UniProtKB/Swiss-Prot annotation:
Function: Lipid-binding protein with higher affinity for phosphatidic acid, a lipid enriched in recycling endosome membranes. On endosome membranes, acts as a downstream effector of Rab proteins recruiting cytosolic proteins to regulate membrane tubulation. Involved in a late step of receptor-mediated endocytosis regulating for instance endocytosed-EGF receptor trafficking. Alternatively, regulates slow endocytic recycling of endocytosed proteins back to the plasma membrane. Also involved in cargo protein delivery to the plasma membrane.
Statement: the UniProt record of this protein carries the keyword Phosphoprotein: yes
Gene Ontology CC annotation, any one: ciliary membrane
GO biological process: cell migration involved in sprouting angiogenesis; cilium assembly; endocytic recycling; endocytosis; neuron projection development; plasma membrane tubulation; protein localization to cilium; protein localization to endosome
Modified residues (Phosphoserine): 295, 309, 391, 470-471, 484, 486, 578, 621, 740
PANTHER family on file: CALPONIN HOMOLOGY DOMAIN-CONTAINING PROTEIN DDB_G0272472-RELATED, MICAL-LIKE PROTEIN 1
Gene label: MICALL1
Residues where Phosphothreonine is found: 318, 467, 469
Region of interest called Necessary and sufficient to associate with tubular recycling endosome membranes, mediate phosphatidic acid-binding and membrane tubulation, as start-end residue ranges on this chain: 700-863
Protein name according to UniProt: MICAL-like protein 1
Location of the LIM zinc-binding domain: 162-225
Record's subcellular location: Recycling endosome membrane; Late endosome membrane; Cell projection, Cilium membrane; Cytoplasm, Cytoskeleton, Microtubule organizing center, Centrosome, Centriole
InterPro entries: bMERB_dom, CH_dom, CH_dom_sf, F-actin_Monoox_Mical, Znf_LIM
Biased composition (Polar residues): 325-340
């Protein structure tokens, strides 16, 4: 015992050197006035206390200050009671050693700096080695005296601090458990109902005075949730370690007769309540020394500052998956519900109308979510069947088909014709998208694009006015003389400059580009064209034919002459079956997604006017109705059809992005509750029960070993017993560490479950259209967001604590193993060294004798 004790004593002397009134002669009475504790704290953390203001006569205040500062600022639990220090002339040596070892472990153990709260300039300290390297002979002698004399003296002077508040029996060091400033046996601090160990911060006063009921137990039996009753993960480990340190320290002060404490009580000792310091995140520090091992439990209660910092710092970004979900919710609230559904692209979101892009048409079909069915319901393809009425001119019919629903025409006519005609339809994108969305009802819903042209065209049957309208889509139409109307001619010329009317193959590309140009160029004209003929002006090619119905058809026929074949099949196919058109349109939509839906809408109006001024106004109303139906669909992101064609055209010119819905109409994402490393509650409690049984067995062994150490028996084996003592304390510390880790895991899983619930509720709220939100909804959103941030912060705090504890514990374990091996090696090396020394000495004597004999003989031989 002299070795470890001497090393610790030498370290204390170095730390207290230069402080007035502090003289370290031993590890017992020299610490009674409390100045030695304050001196060690002040050397490393001068910011924590004012040593010059302390008085050697004020024993109680000095000890109280040192114990409180060490516990609150450094996380070292107070194993000693200031009242005990005042009442005892010679404090318990083992308790002092255990407590001081925590100071050494905290200030000198590598890796502790990161765990403890920030210190302002720590003085470097040289860790004391178990061997008496820095230890002076005086220290060793004093240590030996203390080992025998002081321990036995302590036994005679038992103090109230070593008495259990529940059973009034003596509490040994291994059994000590401090809770709310009272000392208990671990086995005495149990739930009155379920007899399970009380956890720090998770118990309440029982019906009778001095009894307790575990909140967790109540949660199991009652409706409560475990997570709510569970104490913060930080407090438990700390309190448990404090309990261990307190037990070690108080057993020593309590004194000598460890026999007074019942062994059964020790075995029963469950890891009871902590000190009522639930928020300390740090775990006990394992002693760099063997002695420190006993103290590690005390280190458990690391500085509360960590917890405070964690709570103060918002961690919404941290929960990574959860945080991302939260961001998604915010995005949804902004108006992109696609994030909620997990879909990045929504059919309504793209604004292909303003800008005709071949790629846009294709993406729309992918956006066949629930809203697609609604869009399909729209009778956009119905106009297709109407074309038969436009039979007077097959080319005109074809052009009509192309104009009103170029997508339909493309799908219906021969594959080649359909492809070409689609490009001509700038509205095709929307139509194609919607058609793809609703393949089941192609006839009913020709395509969103068709619906838009219908609304713009005023004729009930887009096919009639479509013939001229097709020109913008089939850029060939612009070629038809623009004899009918000057505005139409202007538009036709605009379209014609970029698109060749005669070329059938090129029209697809030119038509798409022209459709975009025409949409932008005719935006202003379209506003003026809402009347029958002017409407056709929005579609330049269509306008020319629009005024003179027959000439227009002729011009369209001539312009489509090269593609006349395509047009005729289209006319035939269109009247045959609208459903066929829808699928074909889908196929064509792939190549022509670029066509702008918005631009297409005005074009159909012009086509309608072209067909006949009277029908065009009529058609416009049905088309508007169709669009209105689309607007009614919550999933439809397209501009409201109710707006007049002029308004739509104005929007087209600016091509503003359609505002996405706040998130309504999208399926809610199912929350993920379980993690990859999820541990069922049953497994956690089962392992904790096993740990408790092992702790009881260790306590029983510790009581017997403590009695031997205090009784002064086997003085020759004190060092060996001390090594065994530290090993036992370390083993207990490992169990307590694992127990606290399980508590962390349990708390983490509860927080994760709660976070999932909060996120789900938040998503349900965000899924509601923003226009329908009430003040209560907005207030609830703020509450949920704040709770989500708090949950994430708490989870981050737990993760940080676990990481820091693991790192520190690994270093402590390595240090402990090295010290134990060194101590055992010294014990084994001593006898071997003696044997070798004796053997070598005798051998040397013999060798010397032989050499002398040889020398004496040699001269004689020579002579």
């Amino acid at each position: 015992m002299a070795g470890p004790r001497g090393a610790l004593l030498a370290w204390c002397r170095r730390q207290c050197e230069g402080y007035r009134g502090v003289e370290i002669r031993d590890l017992s009475s020299s610490f009674r006035d409390g100045l030695a504790f304050c001196a060690i704290l002040h050397r490393h953390r001068p910011d924590l206390l004012d040593f010059d203001s302390l008085s050697k006569d004020n024993v109680f205040e000095n000890n109280r200050l040192a114990f409180e500062v060490a516990e609150k600022e450094l996380g070292i639990p107070a194993l000693l009671d200031p009242n005990d220090m005042v009442s005892m002339s010679v404090p318990d040596c083992l308790s002092i050693m255990t407590y001081v070892s925590q100071y050494y472990n905290h200030f000198c153990s590598p890796g502790q700096a990161g765990v403890s709260p920030p210190r302002k300039g720590l003085a470097p300290c040289s860790p004391p080695s178990v061997a008496p390297t820095p230890v002076e002979p005086e220290d060793v002698a004093q240590g030996e005296e203390l080992s025998s004399g002081s321990l036995s003296e302590q036994g005679t002077g038992q103090t109230p601090s070593s008495t259990c508040a529940a059973c009034q029996q003596h509490v040994h060091l291994v059994q000590r458990y401090l809770a709310d400033g009272r000392l208990y046996h671990r086995h005495c601090f149990r739930c009155r109902r379920c007899s399970s160990t009380l956890l720090p911060g998770a118990y309440e006063n029982g019906p009778e005075e001095g009894t307790f009921v575990c909140a967790e137990h109540c949660a199991r039996l009652g409706p409560g949730t475990r997570s709510g009753t569970r104490p913060g993960p930080f407090s438990q480990p700390k309190q448990q370690h404090q309990q261990q340190l307190a037990e070690d320290a108080k057993d020593v002060p309590g004194g000598g007769p460890s026999s007074s404490a019942p062994a059964g009580a020790e075995a029963d000792g469950p890891k009871a309540s902590p000190e009522a310091r639930p928020q300390i995140p740090t775990k006990p520090r394992v002693p760099g020394k063997l002695q420190e091992l006993a103290s590690p439990p005390a280190g458990r209660p690391t500085p509360a500052p960590r917890k405070a910092s964690e709570s103060t710092t918002p961690a919404p970004p941290t929960p990574r998956p959860r945080s991302s979900l939260q961001q998604e919710n915010l995005v949804e609230q902004a108006g992109s519900s696609s994030l909620v559904n997990g879909r990045l692209h929504e059919l309504p979101v793209p604004k292909p109308r303003g800008t005709p892009k071949p790629s846009e048409g294709t993406p729309a079909p992918r956006k066949d979510p629930p809203w697609i069915t609604l869009v399909q319901a729209e009778p956009k393809k119905k106009p297709a069947p109407l074309p038969p009425s436009s039979s007077p001119g097959p080319p005109s019919q074809d052009s009509r088909q192309v104009e009103n629903g170029g997508t339909e025409e493309v799908a219906q006519p021969s594959p080649t014709a359909s492809l070409e005609s689609k490009p001509y339809n700038p509205f095709e994108e929307e139509e194609e998208d919607k058609e793809e969305e609703a393949p089941a009802a192609p006839s009913l819903a020709t395509s969103p694009a068709l619906g838009h042209p219908e609304s713009t065209p005023k004729s009930l049957h887009p096919w009639y006015g479509i013939t001229p309208t097709s020109s913008p889509k089939t850029k060939k139409r612009p070629a038809p003389r623009a004899p009918s109307a000057s505005p139409l001619a202007l538009h036709a010329s605009r379209l014609s400059h970029s698109e060749p009317p005669s070329a059938t193959p090129s029209p697809a590309l030119s038509v798409e580009s022209l459709s975009s140009e025409s949409a932008s160029q005719t935006a202003g004209a379209e506003l003026l064209e809402p009347p029958a003929v002017p409407k056709s002006s929005s579609e330049p090619a269509v306008h020319a034919p629009g005024t003179p119905g027959n000439p227009v058809s002729l011009s369209t026929n001539s312009s489509l002459a090269s593609s006349g074949e395509l047009v005729e099949p289209r006319v035939e196919q269109m009247p045959q079956a609208s459903p066929g058109l829808a699928p074909r349109t889908r196929g064509s939509s792939g190549p022509q997604p670029a066509k702008p839906c918005s631009g297409a809408t005005p074009t159909p109006l012009l086509l309608v006017g072209d067909r006949s001024p009277v029908p065009s106004p009529g058609s416009s109303s049905p088309q508007l109705q169709v669009k209105s139906s689309c607007k009614e669909n919550p999933f439809n992101r397209k501009p409201s059809p109710a707006a007049s064609p002029a308004t739509k055209k104005a929007t087209k010119g600016s091509k503003p992005v359609r505002p996405p819905a706040p998130g309504h109409g999208f399926p809610l994402i199912k929350r993920k509750v379980q993690a990859d490393q999820y541990i069922p509650e049953e497994d956690i409690h089962g392992e904790m029960d096993t740990i408790e049984r092992r702790l009881d067995a260790l306590e029983h062994r510790g009581v017997l070993l403590e009695e031997k150490l205090r009784g002064g028996l086997n003085e020759g084996r004190e060092d060996d017993m001390l090594v065994d003592w530290f090993k036992l304390i370390h083993e207990k510390h490992l169990l307590v560490r694992r127990e606290s880790e399980l508590i962390y895991v349990f708390k983490q899983q509860n927080l994760e479950q709660r976070q999932a619930d909060v996120e789900y509720e938040l998503r349900c709220l965000l899924n509601k259209p923003e226009k329908d939100w009430t003040e209560e909804d907005r207030a609830r959103e703020k509450v949920l967001m704040q709770e989500l941030v708090t949950l994430i912060e708490q989870r981050n705090a737990i993760i940080n604590c676990l990481d820091e504890d693991r790192q520190r514990e690994e270093e402590e374990d390595k240090m402990l193993e090295a010290m134990i091996k060194k101590k055992e090696f010294q014990r084994e090396a001593e006898p071997e060294g003696k044997k070798k020394g004796k053997f070598k000495t005798m051998k040397m004597l013999k060798l010397l004798g032989n050499k002398r004999d040889a020398k004496s003989k040699s001269p004689r031989d020579k002579s």
